[in-house]
Design a protein with these regions (language model features):
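Short strand-turn segments of transmembrane beta-barrel domains in outer membranes
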Residues: 1-23, 44-45
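Transmembrane beta-barrel strands of outer-membrane/channel proteins
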Residues: 4-8, 37-39, 71-75, 159-169
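Strand-connecting loop/turn motifs
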Residues: 28-30, 62-67, 156-158
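Outer-membrane beta-barrel translocator/channel fold
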Residues: 43-55, 59-124
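Outer-membrane beta-barrel transmembrane strands
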Residues: 111-165
Length: 176
């Protein structure tokens, strides 16, 4: 399974772009692996309002008779500019007074309270679970056609040992 998507809205000054990718494959009937990527970049309508989000992950699974494993790794990286709001409300409440003789002005020309202030959040998540089954094999008949019978070995689990690992790391930076 593969899916690639690209979205773009508005122009290069205040538009948004998003790229998404999903990939998964089964190597055989027991083992599968895949990844995903999601990247979003928005420039914002006002000054110092851009955002950049990157999310990605890897995953894998194995399902055997005696051993099972499921694994996932996620990474989230979020970077947002902070503008503290519009510096003077009259740009919204009385725009003609603030246009300085111009007929109109653009939203990104409106002064904001803050510039060059950023929030940067990152997080990493790992989850893995394993299971080992103890048991025995027994013979089972399997009819291939009307006139033939095949004997196969089937595993019968009696008890299991399970191990789970989870790690979550979160960080935040504020850049002025």
């Amino acid at each position: 399974f593969t899916n690639l998507s690209y979205y773009k809205t508005f122009d290069s000054r205040n538009g948004e772009e998003r790229f998404k990718s999903y990939f998964a494959i089964n190597a055989n009937k027991r083992f599968g692996v895949g990844f995903y990527i999601d990247y979003l970049y928005g420039r914002g309508l006002y000054a110092s309002q851009s955002t950049a989000f990157f999310n990605g992950g890897l995953f894998a699974s194995y399902r055997g008779d005696k051993y099972n494993m499921h694994f996932i790794f996620n990474n989230d990286n979020l970077k947002m500019a902070e503008n503290g709001g519009i510096a003077d409300d009259r740009y919204i409440t009385n725009p003609l007074d603030m246009a300085e003789g111009k007929k109109e002005y653009k939203s990104y020309d409106i002064p904001t309270n803050l510039n060059k202030v950023w929030n940067h959040n990152t997080s990493y998540h790992v989850f893995m679970t394993q299971r080992y089954n103890l048991g025995f094999h027994k013979e089972k008949t399997d009819s291939v056609t009307k006139d033939s019978v095949r004997i196969i070995q089937e595993f019968v689990p009696i008890t299991s040992f399970i191990h789970t690992l989870q790690v979550d790391l979160n960080g935040r930076k504020r850049l002025y």
